[in-house]
Every structure is written in structure tokens, then in C-alpha cells.
UniProtKB/Swiss-Prot annotation:
Changing residue 358 to S: In strain: DSR 1. This is Major heat shock 70 kDa protein Ba. Residues 612-635 have a biased composition (Gly residues). Changing residue 483 to T: In strain: DSR 2. PROSITE patterns: HSP70_1, HSP70_2, HSP70_3. The keyword ATP-binding applies. One of its GO terms (molecular function) is ATP binding.
């Protein structure tokens, strides 16, 4: 039984299978090799694909599309609010998650985006089964490289709902690179930039392809909310305003008229890729009024100018992350229907100083082609040219946990190869602490408040011990689908707990991802200052507690009472100062450290305990996690990183 590759797109989906040594892209029952990602609900039936899109003007409120723009997001995501202005169907909040409300067979129904996507996936599965003449369960499904953990998990869930065993979730540009590398029989080592601009998402990935068989992703960047639909929206707004200006009627209140206008705008956009002018003719568009107009390519380019320019920022970022300059890129490969737009091509060509773009692979089918190859590899196909293929992908965002002072301590860095596993040792933050709370984040900023919380779990039952003594091993395991599993283990008792980060944790909005990554560069200096400030605070805190503990536990006769009281008074003063100056600057912490060292060092030297005291308590380090259960009534962080 063969495995299939599915490109689940925002506007169109495509399915392929690898057999007899080649990939076949499978046509649907209408004879089309791509299927609209549309689902319609009527009084009598549910329609998927071409039939759903064909009846959209008659039934706009109950025809659902763009599920990929909703999947794995929260209802209050500003991007969803923006999209809702353009959608004729109703999106409602269900416990903070978006649900789509439709009328089906006379009843009101609510569907999650995963359910709508699963219906499209089921259609692709049926298309493949009809062609192959047997039932299919195994599949590889593609997602934008910049999809976060929640969106990947939700896509995988959609596959399961559709009755598929999802062998792997792979990144769309990586799949396209696989198609390009195998199709072109590349020789030697080549750096390839995949520019993937589809109906709703945009990705840039740079790969090094060695002898057409080793595919190593060097970097990835993008915007999960930029694509052909956004260009359509600009054109629809322009045409609706022209209609209002000409006829003093606002058609935007009428979903059917707006849908007919959108269909005409999409057709005009496609025409403008090959002609310099497109004609729009719609009979009885609104209140019996016909609408005839022309749109020039120049006007369309002006309407979308900022969106087109925005495609170059991720290209620059991908080059920077891959540590390459423009001249080191051998091939620029265009993927996704929106790369047919001449202005997008010319901007990219100018950016690369006139270098020719590679237009030799089918931009609509390349991703499904690569997914089909990966499906064959994962199901054990050893035939021909795919037997030596090795694919090495990367994590799109850094992953870590919160340590004292709200610092993001990264365990897995952005653009790190996947699958990967990283372990770090942390400890408790206060004496006799019975448990720790591990808070998991993704993002690029230095402080967790600027990143996105993925999940949290508590590890309890830690035996009573001084702060810094228990050893808690935290392991991040990022699987080949880009889905994260986190575990924590207390080494002396062997107690362990783990969590798979799922999309029910109140996940990241795309606006936040964009902000995190883009602002990380802008605020690098500020982040570094904040990091240093927290490091200085932690060093002072660690030192003062270690000194205090050493003096309190000093054997009788090792230290005279006056010295002991002098050190304890100074330590208690410092602790009080720390409690009332939590937001002090780095210089203030450093000054206090000098003052305390000057006062305590001579006395500690007398004791011959300087090194031993610090060692016993685990030394200065970063501290981790907000306390979940309020252990011992202490409300601060509850784990400490061990050097």
C-alpha cells in the first residue's frame, strides 16, 4: 500500500504519489491537478473542492475556505479579526478558539478549523484512492516552514480526523527543494533559495543540496499570513470603492455581490500576470447594476506595492541566518502560484542583482511532489534515485524555559537541526523547596514575557535540601514533525514528569511571532542589557546566601562571634536591599557585590571556607521558572540552573 504526499494549501491543495520510480500528481474527479481548499454546506449535502467553490456566489455564508489561516490560532489573534472583514462566513469564539458557524441541513453547526481542513484532506485521500484503486492511510502533509508548534499539531490532528496516519509533517519549501533537487539531477554542492509565495502563506528557505541527495536546510524565514488572498483583498477593496464612486451604492453589505466581485478580482489578478490590462464584466452585480471596468497591471502593482516589498525582508533574514551573502546562492527557485506575478519576480531579481530566477518546476505542484517523495522514503521505498536521499530540516523558533528574573534560558536554538534533543541541569531556588514548576516558551527575546508560553508542568516530591543542591534534569525533545516533548527528572529520587506541547495551551498568534523575531534584532542591545542585569542580580543573590549559609553552619570555634554577627548583619542588609530593589540596574548590583565581598572576604578567608561554602550551594547560576504551587509560600522562581 503506497503512502501519499499532500500539499494542504490555503486556497488550493494537491496530492501526489511516488511509484514506478517517479512522482505522479493525481487529478481529481473534475480532471484538475489542484483542488480548491473549500467546503460548502447546503440544505441537503456537503460539498468539497471544485463543487464547493463553484457554488460559492449562491451560498457565500455556508461556504468555508481559508481554514489554514485559522488553524492553530486563538480567536483574539488580530490577523483573524482582519481576515473576518473579508470572509462571508461567520467565525465565533469557543473558549478562546475560533469556530466556524454554518447552516447545514437546516441546523446550525460549529466546526473547528481542524475539522474543515480534515474534510479537504479526506477529499485528497479519496482522489488518491480512486486513482490507485486501493485504500490509503499513510501520508506526509506539508505546512509552511514558519508554522508554530500549535499550527503543526493542529494540522496533524486534521490528518487524524481525516483517517490518515500522518507519517511526517514537513515544511513546504523543504518539500519543494526535494522536488527541485530530484527533478534536476543536481551535481556537486549547491546553495538553493526556495521562495514560496502561495495563496495565504509565505516562506523562504535556504538549503544546501549535495549531489542531489543530501538536502540540508540552512535557514528558514517567512510570514504565515501573506499570500495571494491578500493581493485579492486589495483589488476587491479598490473595485468596491470604484463601484461606490460610480453608482453611489455600497455593495460591501451584500455577501453575494462581494463574492462575485472577489471571483472576478481573482480572475483579473491571474490575467495581469500575462497581460498588462484585465477587463472586469459583472452583470447585475448589486441592486440590478452592471459593473464593467478595466484594471491595469501598474494599478494592481501600486495597490499591493507594500505587500510585494515585504517579501524581501524574510529573504534578507534567511541569508543572514544562513551566514551567506547573495553571491553564494546558486539557484533561486520559485514555488507557489503567487510567484507568477511579474512584479514579485522583478523585485526578487533586482535584489539578487539581476540573477536569473529558476522557473523550471511547476509552482503549484512542487510541494506535493516533494511530499510524495518523502512519503515513499518514510514508508521504506528503496527504489532508484530516492534511496540515497537524506533530508535535514531545522526548528523555526528557539525553545527554552523561564529562569529567575524571567530570563528565557534556551535549550534549542532557532535554525537548529531537527529532530534534536537537548538536556540541561537546573536546581531549586529556595531551601527545602518541595517542587518546581517548569515553564516552556518559544521565541527569540531575552525575557520570557516577550516570548510565547507553550505550556507548564510541576515536578513535586523533591526531598528537603538547601537551595542549589537538588539536581533537576530538563530535556527538550523536538521530533521530526517539529512538535516538542519536554521532560524533567529529579536525579536523587528518579521522579520524572513530561509534557507534549499541544495546541490547547493558548498558543501564539502570528502577529506575536512576527513581533518576536523582528523585534529581537531591534532590541538586541536592550535584551543584552537586561540579560546582564539579571546575571548580576543572580550572582549577588547566590553569593549572599552562600556566605550566610557558610557562616551559620561554621563549626564552633572556627569563627569568633563578632565576625559572625558582622557577616550575618551585612548579609541580611543585602537581602533586604535585594527584596526592595528588584528592578535595580546592573551597576547597582555590581556595586553591592563589591561592597559585600570587601566586607566578607577577609572573614571568610580566616575560616578557610571561601571555596567550599560557594561550592556546597551550587554556585551562582541562572534561576528558573515561576512557582506554580507556591511552595513554602515563596512566590518567585523555583528552579536554578546548575553550571
Amino acid at each position: 500500500m503506497p503512502a501519499i504526499g499532500i500539499d494542504l494549501g490555503t486556497t488550493y491543495s494537491c496530492v501526489g504519489v511516488y511509484q514506478h520510480g517517479k512522482v505522479e500528481i493525481i487529478a481529481n474527479d473534475q480532471g484538475n491537478r489542484t483542488t480548491p481548499s473549500y467546503v460548502a454546506f447546503t440544505d441537503s449535502e456537503r460539498l468539497i473542492g471544485d463543487p464547493a467553490k463553484n457554488q460559492v456566489a449562491m451560498n457565500p455564508r455556508n461556504t468555508v475556505f481559508d481554514a489554514k489561516r485559522l488553524i492553530g490560532r486563538k480567536y483574539d489573534d488580530p490577523k483573524i479579526a482582519e481576515d473576518m472583514k473579508h470572509w462571508p462566513f461567520k467565525v465565533v469564539s469557543d473558549c478562546g478558539k475560533p469556530k466556524i458557524g454554518v447552516e447545514y441541513k437546516g441546523e446550525s453547526k460549529r466546526f473547528a478549523p481542524e475539522e474543515i481542513s480534515s474534510m479537504v484532506l479526506a477529499k485528497m485521500k479519496e482522489t488518491a484512492e480512486a486513482y490507485l484503486g486501493e485504500s490509503i492511510t499513510d501520508a506526509v502533509i506539508t505546512v509552511p516552514a514558519y508554522f508554530n508548534d500549535s499550527q503543526r499539531q493542529a494540522t496533524k490532528d486534521a490528518g487524524h480526523i481525516a483517517g490518515l496516519n500522518v507519517l511526517r509533517i514537513i515544511n513546504e519549501p523543504t518539500a519543494a527543494a526535494l522536488a527541485y533537487g530530484l527533478d534536476k539531477n543536481l551535481k556537486g554542492e549547491r546553495n538553493v533559495l526556495i521562495f514560496d509565495l502561495g495563496g495565504g502563506t509565505f516562506d523562504v528557505s535556504i538549503l544546501t543540496i549535495d549531489e542531489g541527495s543530501l538536502f540540508e536546510v540552512r535557514s528558514t524565514a517567512g510570514d504565515t499570513h501573506l499570500g495571494g488572498e491578500d493581493f485579492d483583498n486589495r483589488l476587491v477593496t479598490h473595485l468596491a470603492e470604484e463601484f461606490k464612486r460610480k453608482y453611489k451604492k455600497d455593495l460591501r453589505s451584500n455577501p453575494r455581490a462581494l463574492r462575485r466581485l472577489r471571483t472576478a478580482a481573482e480572475r483579473a489578478k491571474r490575467t495581469l500576470s500575462s497581460s498588462t490590462e484585465a477587463t472586469i464584466e459583472i452583470d447585475a452585480l448589486f441592486e440590478g447594476q452592471d459593473f464593467y471596468t478595466k484594471v491595469s497591471r501598474a494599478r494592481f502593482e501600486e495597490l499591493c506595492a507594500d505587500l510585494f516589498r515585504n517579501t524581501l525582508q524574510p529573504v534578507e533574514k534567511a541569508l543572514t541566518d544562513a551566514k551567506m551573502d547573495k553571491g553564494q546562492i546558486h539557484d533561486i527557485v520559485l514555488v507557489g502560484g503567487s510567484t507568477r506575478i511579474p512584479k514579485v519576480q522583478s523585485l526578487l531579481q533586482e535584489f539578487f542583482h539581476g540573477k536569473n530566477l529558476n522557473l523550471s518546476i511547476n509552482p503549484d505542484e512542487a510541494v506535493a511532489y516533494g511530499a510524495a517523495v518523502q512519503a515513499a522514503i518514510l514508508s521504506g521505498d528503496q527504489s532508484g534515485k530516492i534511496q540515497d536521499v537524506l533530508l535535514v530540516d531545522v526548528a523555526p523558533l528557539s525553545l527554552g524555559i523561564e529562569t529567575a528574573g524571567g530570563v528565557m534560558t534556551k535549550l534549542i536554538e532557532r535554525n537548529c537541526r531537527i529532530p534534536c534533543k537537548q538536556t540541561k541541569t537546573f536546581s531549586t531556588y529556595s531551601d527545602n523547596q518541595p517542587g518546581v514548576s517548569i515553564q516552556v516558551y518559544e521565541g527569540e527575546r531575552a525575557m520570557t514575557k516577550d516570548n510565547n508560553a507553550l505550556g507548564t508542568f510541576d515536578l513535586s516530591g523533591i526531598p528537603p535540601a538547601p537551595r542549589g543542591v537538588p539536581q533537576i534534569e530538563v530535556t527538550f525533545d523536538l521530533d521530526a514533525n517539529g512538535i516538542l516533548n519536554v521532560s524533567a527528572k529529579e536525579m536523587s529520587t528518579g521522579k520524572a514528569k513530561n509534557i507534549t506541547i499541544k495546541n490547547d495551551k493558548g498558543r501564539l498568534s502570528q502577529a506575536e511571532i512576527d513581533r518576536m523575531v523582528n523585534e529581537a534584532e531591534k532590541y538586541a542591545d536592550e535584551d543584552e542589557k537586561q540579560r546582564q542585569r539579571i546575571t548580576s542580580r543572580n550572582a549577588l543573590e547566590s553569593y549572599v546566601f552562600n556566605v550566610k549559609q557558610s557562616v551559620e553552619q561554621a563549626p564552633a570555634g572556627k569563627l569568633d562571634e563578632a565576625d559572625k554577627n558582622s557577616v550575618l548583619d551585612k548579609c541580611n542588609d543585602t537581602i533586604r536591599w535585594l527584596d526592595s530593589n528588584t528592578t535595580a540596574e546592573k551597576e547597582e548590583f555590581d556595586h553591592k557585590m563589591e561592597e559585600l565581598t570587601r566586607h566578607c572576604s577577609p572573614i571568610m578567608t580566616k575560616m578557610h571556607q571561601q571555596g567550599a561554602g560557594a561550592g556546597a550551594a551550587g554556585g551562582p547560576g541562572a534561576n528558573c521558572g515561576q512557582q506554580a504551587g507556591g511552595f513554602g509560600g515563596y512566590s518567585g522562581p523555583t528552579v536554578e540552573e546548575v553550571d
